[in-house]
């Protein structure tokens, strides 16, 4: 199946005709509701993925290059892709203590905002993004799935963030406290990054974090 998906992508990029079997594989890989329009949807997925990941890397570049020199280019690209794909992998544990994740950048508004945004954008799913790009603010034309995903995402970010702000991170300056609260409400569902020591969070916040992990992201 993996080889078939790679062949589909190769043929799509090269402009070759996509067979019925390949279209079926593409439908399965993208969780599309029907086979019709699957080639166009796959092209859209490739374009929007490249757009977000390259834009994210460009925004992360100043921070990582300032800390790691030319290696920062690779770090920016890697973490942008990892965040958008909701993978949660990082390269920062090789620079000191293990399992540090993004704690070094807890007070960096640019990096934490970009990473959090990439996680959210990647977690919405491509069918939701197709609705957003096609219908813009005409929300009543969105698929029901997209409406549910957007509403649930907003609630699952806002409510835990308020809880975390009220119960945790009291020792941080107000700006960092807001950043940490928002970041920790975004990342548990799909990515797994952290900018604070999770063991120091209250029991209630840890329980909410576990529930967010169980919830996950959109198809």
Question: Residues of each region from the PLM?
Answer:
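Membrane-proximal intracellular helices of multi-pass ion channels
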Residues: 1-219
